[in-house]
Amino acid sequence: MERTCTRRWRMKLEIPDVKKLVHEMVMPIRWGDMDAMGHLNNASYMRFMETIRIEWFSAIGCEPNPQGQGPVIVNVFCNFYKQLQYPCNVLMKMYVSDAGRSSFESWATFEPVDQPGVIHAAGGATTIWVDFPAQKSAPLPDWMRALIS
């Protein structure tokens, strides 16, 4: 028996209006970042978001410490609005919001440098603060909470 899908499934997570801009950087699309259709590959969007997140963590002194505490990403998503194609320099903007006991949300937008304000994609991630030796969540440190709030 052949099965057909009669529903249109659509998962789209919204980027909140209330968020705090914490970091910006320009990333060039490299030839190897493209898919067979000449667009920025879906996996590359995740890599771009990872890159700006890690650059921000480094800028605020949040370096990896397996014997202590630090951030762990527990989910990530990206909404695609317009195609990004090579060659292109992409202005990445990173935002944070929603500080909880041990977590916060981060958001990233993608806009071509030559098209200011035209967002081609936007995504986000949930970050949990973890006590690595105990392998469980820990309260956000006050210094991190102050940066997010």
Stretches found by the model and what they are:
Residues 5, 9-25, 80, 84-86, ...:
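HotDog/MaoC-like acyl-thioester-processing domains
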Residues 18, 42, 69, 74-77, ...:
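Anionic, Ser/Thr-rich low-complexity intrinsically disordered regions
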Residues 31-33, 61, 77-82, 114:
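Short, well-ordered turn and helix-capping elements at secondary-structure junctions
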